[in-house]
Design a protein with these regions (language model features):
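Basic, low-complexity terminal or inter-domain segments flanking catalytic cores
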Residues: 2-12, 26-315
Length: 315
């Protein structure tokens, strides 16, 4: 979203970089690497540090942190990394994505950012007022993109029990605002974390690591919604069309639009894995549900009823 790429464009560029052997497999949802890959990280970071964009951001001979090392959390493919191949003759767009991956790698294996955080609570006329302040003591990973220079709220060296002089007061009146429209970035994030609000503990646990779609399919899901006219892009926002709103009004109360259904299926798949349920039984349940929801949707006049085509009959 920062550079104006759609999710599909980003995935296409990442695929090109992968085919050029510049990055590892891009269709991964993992943020972790196993031990054997971690052994290669110092060499890869040193390689990134030879590139002009990052030469001042990689500390020579620094030991990479292990925050992202956990073989148990690696799915089919480990986290996205650059390889040791030189990124030569890249287009502007390809270069942007490549260096985003390289920069995130440096951040992931840099030291923690250390802050001194101060919380002051002051009492006046029976009312308590709180202010927070922080000062970065060690920039760590924030130094990669210069985030340590962001404005910090510093608080004077007050001591507990100090009496302060009131210099003025004001009342600010405002109204709550609805959540903004989704961008591709926020929608991708929402798809990835879908299910966290499910109340049923078992279903929420089943959804923990899946969400809606996969890293390989989420971009195409968004693109399909656009191509079928359910939404359109307005600058960086995704806006539902009249057709999309009509679809939502029909299916929003159906199980097909309930993220908990995905949790139920994941739970059933786990039972199959444990030998508690036969795959054939699960398949028949899915087939029956598919027939049911298809019939229900096709009978909906709001979606498939007759309407004026806008074309005159030639006869």
């Amino acid at each position: 979203a920062k550079h104006g790429f759609t999710a599909e464009q980003t995935l296409e560029i990442a695929q090109k970089l992968y085919e050029k052997k510049l990055i590892t497999y891009p269709r991964t949802g993992s943020r972790y690497i196993p031990e054997d890959v971690y052994a290669e990280i110092p060499k890869l970071l040193a390689f990134i540090g030879t590139q002009p964009e990052w030469k001042d951001k990689v500390r020579a001979k620094a030991v990479p942190t292990r925050r992202s090392v956990d073989g148990g959390k690696v799915t089919d493919h480990h986290a996205l990394l650059v390889t040791g191949e030189k990124p030569l003759f890249l287009s502007k767009e390809d270069g942007i994505i490549y260096h985003m991956i390289a920069g995130r790698m440096i951040e992931a294996f840099s030291e923690k950012c250390v802050k001194d955080v101060t919380v002051v609570t002051a009492e006046c006329a029976g009312m308590e007022f709180t202010v927070k302040g922080s000062v970065i003591k060690q920039a760590g990973w924030r130094a990669v993109y210069g985030e340590e220079n962001k404005e910090e709220t510093t608080i004077p060296g007050w001591q507990e029990g100090d009496t302060l002089t009131l210099k003025g007061s004001s009342i600010t009146e405002g109204k709550t605002k609805p959540k903004p429209l989704h961008t591709e970035a926020t929608l991708l994030s929402a798809m990835e974390t879908a299910g966290k609000e499910i109340e049923d503990d078992a279903l929420r646990q089943a959804m923990k690591d899946c969400g809606i779609g996969t890293p390989a399919t989420r971009a195409s899901i968004i693109e399909t919604l656009s191509k079928r006219g359910y939404m359109e892009r307005c600058k960086k926002s995704l806006v539902p069309t009249e057709k999309g709103l009509a679809l939502n009004s029909v299916v929003k109360t159906m199980r097909i639009a309930d993220v908990a259904m995905t949790g139920e299926w994941e739970k059933e798949l786990a039972r199959i894995e444990r030998g508690e349920l036969s795959a054939d039984t699960f398949r028949k349940e899915i087939e029956a549900y598919t027939r049911e929801i298809t019939s229900e949707l096709l009978s909906c006049d709001k979606l498939f009823g007759s309407r004026d085509s806008g074309c005159a009959c030639p006869k």
